[in-house]
Design a protein with these regions (language model features):
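Active-site-proximal loop->helix
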Residues: 76-81, 100-104
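Conserved N-terminal beta1-alpha1 strand-loop-helix module at the mouth
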Residues: 1-63, 70-73, 104, 109-132, ...
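Glycine-rich phosphate-binding active-site loops on the catalytic face of alpha/beta enzymes
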Residues: 80-97, 134-144, 184-205
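Extended, folded domain segments that form the structural surfaces/walls around functional sites
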Residues: 52-54, 85, 179
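Glycine-rich anion-binding loop/nest that anchors nucleotide
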Residues: 167-170, 190
Length: 215
């Protein structure tokens, strides 16, 4: 499981509620998670590149940089900020433009997570040479305000099986949903809002990571 630090969302509003995001990341790191995702997009999610730097410096886990990354300069900023991997969104980048971004990321020893939300996007990226494939259960083009569930992963996972690990992203908040993602073919899940909104973060992290893998 990848746990996420996100300041706010268009759908849920303030997610930090006055808490220190670095302290939250350190608490997450005490649980058996694979890494931490940090959202730095400012306009819709309230992030900043300084948040990536602070979290990466504070935890001994791989850190995924999530933003609307479309330029090589942003990849350089990801590397300088301490990221281990970056997100590239198929809905926002044509394949021919994604190729130099993947090449640039590899030069900086950054893994690439390429995210799709539809069958057309899965087909669009399948021939590219990247590291991890993600299925976003929500629609990032409308800033994830849609009401969806892990059904999107169940629908698309069979088209993503192969040489790359598959990550089910968003709309996951219970052990049952983690199991559904795993049974559909996902190798991992990325969970953010549900963890940050939980009354006791330690309890939901324990619940989600207790599912084990493979499901």
């Amino acid at each position: 499981m990848i746990s996420e630090i996100k300041v706010r969302s268009e759908k849920e509003g303030d997610l930090l509620r006055g808490r220190d995001p670095v302290a939250l990341a350190q608490e997450m790191a005490h649980h058996p998670i694979a890494g931490i995702s940090v959202v730095t997009e400012p306009s819709h999610f309230g992030g900043q590149i300084g948040l990536l730097r602070a979290v990466a410096a504070a935890v001994d886990l791989p850190v995924l940089h999530k933003d609307f990354i479309t330029t090589e300069q942003q990849i350089e900023e990801s590397a300088a900020g301490g990221a281990s991997a970056i997100l590239l969104i198929a809905a926002m980048i044509d394949p021919e433009l994604m190729i130099p971004l993947i090449t640039k990321a590899r030069r900086y020893s950054l893994e690439t997570l390429v995210e799709a939300h539809s069958f057309a996007e899965v087909k669009k990226i399948e021939q590219l040479d990247f590291d991890l494939v993600g299925i976003n259960n929500r629609d990032i083009t409308i800033f994830e305000v849609d009401d969806t569930d892990v059904g999107r992963t169940e629908e698309l996972a069979r088209f993503c099986k192969g040489r790359r690990p598959l990550i089910s992203e968003s709309s996951i908040g219970t052990a049952g949903e983690v199991r559904r993602a795993g049974k559909s073919g996902a190798d991992a899940v990325l969970v953010g809002t549900a963890i940050l909104q939980a009354t006791r973060m330690a309890d939901i992290l324990a619940e989600l990571t207790s599912v084990g893998w493979p499901v």
